[in-house]
Each structure stands twice: as C-alpha cells, then as structure tokens.
C-alpha cells in the first residue's frame, strides 16, 4: 500500500521528531493577524505578532513585553528605529520558524539582519549570518561589513574581512566603501602591518577620506601614515602640497629615513597565516646558489647524492649563500628547511632577512651548532623580501646542501631563549628527525619510537657495554632543554647506575645528571638547569645483573602528562599512557646494528659510523 505522507526525517526507534511540522504551524501564524496581541511598526509598515512567542524566543522581547513598561499594554504598537522592514521581516520569520534564507538578500539587508540578531540576543543566528557573510566578501561590500563586524565585536567576521582587505589592499583603498568607513574602523585597517599597500596610495586614500568626512579629526587620521616609508620625491611633491601635515613632520620623516637602518623601518608586508609563501604560486624564486630549481619544487622525497638539492660552497668569509626572493614583502616568523640527510652528516648555518639586499638582519644563528634533516625554526615576526641561508660547516665536506625551504607566518605559540626554541613537547622523536647515533639495538631508533610497552629480553631496547661507549641521541637542531625522561629495562629486578651529559657540538660536554652512586630502576625523571643541547649522552656505569646498560625509551623534555605509571604494572609493560610516534617518511632510516646480544647481556658494542 502506498504511503501518501511526506517523507520525514529519520529518527531512532522510540523517538518522535516532528520539529519541522511544529515550525511550519507556528510559522503559519505570521501569514495572518489571528491571535496577534502586539504590533511593531518599521518604516511605516505594521507587523502583527504574538507576545508569548517573542518572549519565549528572546530575552529582550520578554523584558520589553512583560516588564511592566508601556509596550506591555494590550494591543500596543511599538515603533522600531535603526532597522529596515526587510531585515525585520527576516527576523520575525526566524523567530517563528528557526529558518532564514540569506542567499537572495542584498548585503545591506544582511548587515541590518546581523545587527538585529546582535541587538536582540540571537548568538546562533549571529554566528550563522557572519559565516555566510564571510563567503560573499568582495571589494564593494568588505568595508561596510568590517564596520559592522567591528561595531559588534564579531571576531571571526572581523578576521575574515581583515584577511580579505590585506590581500586586496590597493583595490580596497580605491573603493567607494572605503570612504564610508567609520574613523575607528578606518584606523584599525590602515594601522595594520599586514595592510600592505604602497604608502603613497594609503596617504592619498586617507586624504580622500578626510575630504568626505570633514568633521573628523584629520590630524589623528594622518598619524596613521608611515611617512619614513615614502620616498623624498613623494614627501615633497605629494604629502607637502596637501597641507595636512606640518613641515616638521615631513622633515622628521626624512631624518628617520636617512639615519635609520633599513630593516628598522616599520615596513608593511603581506600576511598569509599558516601557508608556505616560498612557492611559485606566490612569486618566490631562488636568486643565488647552485642548482636553484630544486629548492622550491616541493619535492622532499626524491633526492640523493646527485640531484634534488640546492647548494653553495662553504667559505671562511661567509660570502656565499642560498638566497630566496619572495614575491612581495611579507611578514614571517617561521621557517622550515630540509638539510640533505641521506647519511649521518651534520651542518651549521645562519639565516638572514632583508628588504633591499643591502641591510641584513640575522634571525637564526646555528653557526655554532650541529644540525641535521628538518629544521623547524621560529623567530620574532619580521617583514622581509629576501631570505639568505649561509652554511658555515659540513661534517663531511665543504659544501652546504638544502633539499627544501618553506617560510610562513604562524599563530602557533612558541617560546625563545637565547634565540633557541624552548620546546614543550617531546622533540626526541623520529617525526622530529632525532636519531640515535651511538648505541646498539635491533632498530637503531627503537629508543625514540615512543613504544614503552612492547619490549622483552630480546628486543625493544638500546644498550652499550659498560666501560665502553654510550647511548647518544642527536636532536635535529639545538633546543633549550631542562629535563629528560628515561625508561630503563625492567623485565626483572635489576638496577642500574648512569650519568647524563649534553652538548651542542659533540666536542664539549656538560654533565647534567650524576646517578653513578644511585641504584636506579624503570622510569627515570631528570631535571637540570635549562641550557642549549643538540646531543644527549647517556653513559651506564653499573648493572646489578651483567656488564651491559639497557634503555627502552628516551624523551626530552620530560612529558609530565605521561607520568601515570601504575605501581601494580608488570615489569616490561612500560607506560601505557605514552602514545606511539608515527614514522616520518622523510626521516633518515637507521641501519641495524651489526652485533646484538640475544638478551640483555655483556656483548654490546656501538654500530659502525658511516663516513660517506
């Protein structure tokens, strides 16, 4: 037998959901004037409504219609100002049905609708309308949308408007909407470092705005112009004839321009958060260095001794280097680069940025540290057009090799000390390109794979012979470290003694923990004064069972959230709260040790080191 009823939303057995029918029936009350007990007047148009529905849906109307004021009288007519009939019609439909159609409305109506949602306290409607407005931003509507978003403190819509205006700064300056901006909104736009139009264009647009807004304080507006960024010709032939800036202000700008370092000027730059701008898409190119084409092609897998990298010879005066020119001045605070890592070599280098290729500011200095593979670098935000990477050392030869380069602005929080990152998360992982460069294991990086449960007499640990060698971990780059954590092999009741040293160059070592006279078992938490470290060396000095020191897991800095060991846990199960690390496909693969003891025993020795 056929079913003549319309399709209904699927509901679970035992649940009835007829909300759509309820919405339709209540919405039908808007069509006629039946049962209406209050009337709103907007632009001389009357809107009959129902007090109880309005009060149930909105705290504002509840107070207005049932608060004992004049509007609470029966059959009252309530005039509403500062809105339009079209926007109020949309709001009433939303109140009665929970629905609103935005796609067919003009931007002005949508902004009035957004204002009503804010005024009457409909946060979900406010969010949904803001999200739709984000999708229809264009040169004609972005300024008035930004004005409303700023007025009502709508962070997402405000941010999207700013990003759109930043990427279309010159077009926005020339638009009619720019002249209609409020003074507050205008200053919020042009004071941004990321509003990267030429300063002359900004000055002329502000001059035009002042002519259309004669009652405003023009001096305050003109203070937003960064006069030192303008040329002498522009200052004398464009700014001076306007009469809006004093001769002293112009002379001060000339003085700042002539006496300051170029990189100390308050430049504007393009801001594209969380996206690599060192790409052909954004007009970036390698302008100095050998084999330029490989650096920005995005290929981080297909490289070897002969291809897939850019390079430069390492010389004592550091005149050589690899230089990238960005498509336009940009704001960056994060660089990622991949050093050639098909063997165990390490590099030292520094990175400088510039606007004119004459004045360079050093933002990263790893010239006294040994680094390998992926470098994740952070520094205070800078506006720059040129980036120069200069290699100062290669442990194998006199050539500096880079496989890939990325730069961007990131909103990720980071802490710097002495120019180095102070990590909060464990950086001794395969994904972070850390490596075990000394010590014996069936898999050389088993110590760093995050597995603290699966180990036994035969596998899952790294070891060294007491009195000979050590376990050494190399981090991909120097960090400021103040803690580490170890899991000593604990499948029986043995105990160990050991000490820990750190280094930045494998030459000078600093002892940070001395437990040579302590009986240690299982998990070890080591804290010490924070200091730069690229290498961590763990040296076992005693084992109550045999002549080999065994370590299952290493991390730095210590991850406090992982310290949930159960006192009743069986030996060998490790810490179940520690997640496994995923293998980075770009990380170097370690060869297996040439000689491994069948169980924790005295026959360990260090793996052979490659010298290619």
Swiss-Prot record:
Tissues of expression: Expressed in the brain (at protein level).
Domain BACK intervals: 142-240
Region described as Disordered: 559-612
GO BP annotations, alphabetical order: adult locomotory behavior; circadian behavior; circadian sleep/wake cycle, non-REM sleep; long-term memory; modulation of chemical synaptic transmission; multicellular organismal-level iron ion homeostasis; regulation of synaptic vesicle endocytosis; sensory perception of temperature stimulus
BTB domain residues: 36-104
Origin: domain of life: Eukaryota
Alphabetical list of Gene3D superfamilies matching this protein: 1.25.40.420, Galactose-binding domain-like, Potassium Channel Kv1.1, Chain A
CDD domains the record matches: BACK_BTBD9, BTB_POZ_BTBD9
Amino acid composition bias (Low complexity), ranges on this chain: 589-612
Protein name according to UniProt: BTB/POZ domain-containing protein 9
């Amino acid at each position: 037998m056929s079913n003549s009823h319309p399709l209904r939303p699927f509901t679970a057995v035992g649940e009835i959901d007829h909300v759509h029918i309820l919405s339709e029936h209540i919405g039908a009350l808007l069509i006629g004037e039946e049962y209406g007990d209050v009337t709103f007047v907007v632009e001389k148009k009357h809107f009959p409504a129902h007090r109880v529905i309005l009060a149930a849906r909105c705290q504002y109307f509840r107070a207005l219609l049932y608060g004992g004021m004049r509007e609470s009288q029966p059959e009252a007519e309530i005039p509403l100002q500062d809105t339009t009939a079209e926007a109020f019609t949309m709001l009433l439909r939303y109140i009665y049905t929970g629905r609103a159609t935005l796609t067919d409305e003009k931007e002005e109506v949508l902004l009035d609708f957004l204002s009503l949602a804010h005024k009457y306290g409909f946060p979900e409607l406010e969010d949904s309308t803001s999200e739709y407005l984000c999708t229809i931003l264009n040169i004609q509507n972005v300024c008035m949308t930004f004005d409303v978003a700023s007025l009502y403190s709508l962070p997402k819509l405000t941010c999207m408007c700013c990003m759109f205006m930043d990427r279309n700064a010159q077009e926005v300056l020339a638009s009619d909407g720019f002249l209609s901006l409020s003074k507050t909104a205008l200053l919020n736009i042009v004071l941004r470092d990321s509003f990267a139009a030429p300063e002359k264009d900004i000055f002329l647009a502000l001059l035009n705005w002042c002519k259309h807004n004669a009652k405003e304080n023009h001096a305050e507006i003109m203070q937003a112009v960064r006069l030192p960024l303008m040329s002498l010709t522009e200052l004398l032939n464009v700014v001076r004839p306007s009469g809006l800036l004093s001769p002293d202000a112009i002379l001060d700008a000339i003085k700042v321009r002539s006496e300051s370092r170029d990189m100390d000027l308050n430049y504007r730059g393009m801001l594209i958060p969380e996206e690599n701008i060192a790409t052909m898409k954004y007009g970036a190119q390698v302008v100095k260095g050998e084999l330029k084409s490989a650096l920005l092609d995005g290929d981080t897998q297909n490289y070897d001794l002969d291809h897939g990298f850019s390079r430069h010879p390492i010389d004592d005066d550091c005149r050589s280097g690899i230089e990238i020119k960005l498509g336009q001045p940009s704001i960056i605070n994060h660089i990622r680069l991949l050093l050639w890592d098909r063997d165990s070599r390490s590099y030292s280098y520094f990175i400088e940025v510039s606007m004119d290729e004459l004045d360079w500011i050093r933002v990263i200095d790893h010239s006294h540290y040994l680094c390998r593979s992926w470098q994740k670098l952070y520094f205070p935000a800078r506006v720059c057009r040129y980036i120069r990477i200069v290699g100062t050392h290669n442990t194998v030869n006199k050539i500096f090799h880079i496989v890939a380069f990325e730069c961007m602005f990131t909103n990720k929080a980071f802490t710097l000390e002495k120019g180095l990152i102070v990590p909060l998360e464990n950086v001794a992982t395969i994904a972070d390109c850390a490596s075990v460069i000394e010590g014996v294991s069936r898999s050389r990086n088993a110590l760093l794979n995050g597995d603290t449960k699966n180990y036994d007499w035969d596998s899952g640990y790294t070891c060294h012979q007491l009195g000979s060698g050590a376990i050494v971990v190399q981090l991909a780059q120097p960090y400021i470290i103040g803690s580490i954590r170890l899991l000593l092999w604990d499948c029986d009741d043995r105990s160990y003694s050991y000490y820990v040293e750190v280094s930045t160059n494998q030459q000078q070592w600093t002892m940070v923990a001395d437990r040579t006279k302590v009986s240690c078992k299982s998990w070890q938490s080591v804290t010490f004064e924070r200091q730069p470290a690229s290498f961590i060396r763990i040296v076992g000095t005693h084992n109550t069972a045999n002549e080999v020191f065994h370590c299952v897991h290493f991390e730095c800095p210590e991850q406090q959230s992982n310290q949930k060991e159960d006192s009743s846990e069986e030996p060998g199960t490790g810490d179940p709260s520690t997640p496994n690390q995923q293998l980075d496909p770009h990380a170097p693969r370690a060869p297996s040790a040439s000689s491994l003891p069948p169980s924790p025993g005295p026959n360990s020795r260090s793996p052979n080191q490659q010298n290619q």
